[in-house]
């Protein structure tokens, strides 16, 4: 199942802690990429990200997103969007 995850920084989040966790976030994303769970990732050119996950269920994606270091620290929100094929 393909899931889009939109990650946005929380308003008034601790920027020092955010910067401190960025390397751990990158490492976590690289691990997901190497395992085949993260198929692609994009940045809007500012803090935040859009991730494409390949997982079994929407709940799997939500758990993965919640476990990311910045999400676990309460410094980003994650919106999990299941994608479905379109008949064209």
Segment roles from a protein language model:
Residues 1-88:
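Conserved, structured core segments of small domains
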């Amino acid at each position: 199942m393909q899931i889009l995850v939109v990650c946005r920084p929380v308003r008034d989040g601790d920027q020092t802690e955010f910067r401190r966790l960025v390397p751990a976030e990158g490492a976590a994303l690289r691990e997901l990429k190497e395992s085949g769970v993260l198929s692609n990732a994009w940045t809007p050119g500012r803090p935040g990200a859009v991730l494409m996950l390949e997982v079994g269920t929407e709940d799997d994606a939500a758990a993965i997103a919640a476990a990311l270091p910045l999400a676990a620290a309460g410094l980003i929100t994650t919106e999990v969007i299941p994608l479905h094929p379109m008949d064209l």
